[in-house]
């Protein structure tokens, strides 16, 4: 049997969790239909097991053409009004993630941060100067620049050309110049392409496609809408397969989430990647529960984001009863393993609290009662409350019916208290448009397209 040849591009370590550790590549190989080469950059060279049925190829060069960089910046500048997130990102070039003069830190520290913010803004403006320039050009000039760049763009590593795949699959969380080059060159040489978007926020927060692939795989139906409205991609080319690493939630839907002993009561706080004074929220929540139920009677577990943005609020948790998750070595993928321990952290919580993050969506997928932290603070422009209004994908989560939330710490505590008093054990949220746990696995859906 002649096998279909797949070239899979993994240029960031988090994709190892999605495509290798999830078992997706193994499933494709076990189907017997595919010959697979995995292409990585030098940074990932030592992170993959070479003793597998797939071949790992380390790319000597992954740099992009100047035309691809121009197209990528131009597309972002032209499309910056298509998403609230793009607009907020554009503002943060000038104003950074922090309040300009956070007086709550005191005059001396506030002045220091004012100067730091100014330096950061200057660096941002320098690094984004081409985008800023394109954003003020008239359409006739941007069209001419785009036309000239399209005539010259296109580059793909010789290692991929020599393999001559039937399909090139690019796993990505941002549309960057490398993706633009690969898509341009594969069009010229007749290789079919799939861009596999690796999270639910990528289409609304990163950039705009300058060139489109044959197919785009996304997390859910709402992401299909974003692909159409923001990127202008034909609906027939956008496939809501889900995420490879989220197939575990399809298995749990099919087999049922194992019953957990929810005694003692437990509240899990899921940390935010953006700068937000969440430790103040965690402390206030823990203090309230200690007063109402007794010290430590209701467990409060704080799970910080594994890669949080720097915060200027140096507040540290003071309540000694708060259990803070300490991550093991994350050097391989940059993220925690989605293993039994990870799932149990969600399933064993009576209430999951947090900003509108991926982990909150995952808690909803396993039916945990959730409370959104959409409080604001006096230090950061990206606090949960502000981000929830300025990020398109977070607004998608805000729109979910019957999802409790707190705009102030008091409101948040009240919402948590209401769930604990009611003894609510599970909630079925209407989130099929964000992620459908009832469909076939990612591997099954991908195989059907690759062999069609």
Task: Show where each model-derived region lies.
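Active-site and donor-binding regions of nucleotide-sugar-utilizing enzymes
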Residues: 7-33, 37-251, 309, 360
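Short active-site oxyanion
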Residues: 35-36, 167, 211-216, 299-300, ...
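Short acidic-hydrophobic, aromatic-tinged amphipathic segments that line or gate anion-handling sites
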Residues: 57-60, 325-328, 333-334, 399-411
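Conserved catalytic-core segment of nucleotide-activated headgroup transferases in glycan assembly
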Residues: 20, 26, 246-332, 406
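Catalytic binding pocket for nucleotide-activated donors in carbohydrate/polymer assembly enzymes
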Residues: 210-213, 235, 358-434
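C-terminal alpha-helical cap of glycosyltransferases
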Residues: 437-452
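Donor nucleotide-activated moiety binding/catalytic core segment of transferases
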Residues: 160, 307-361, 366
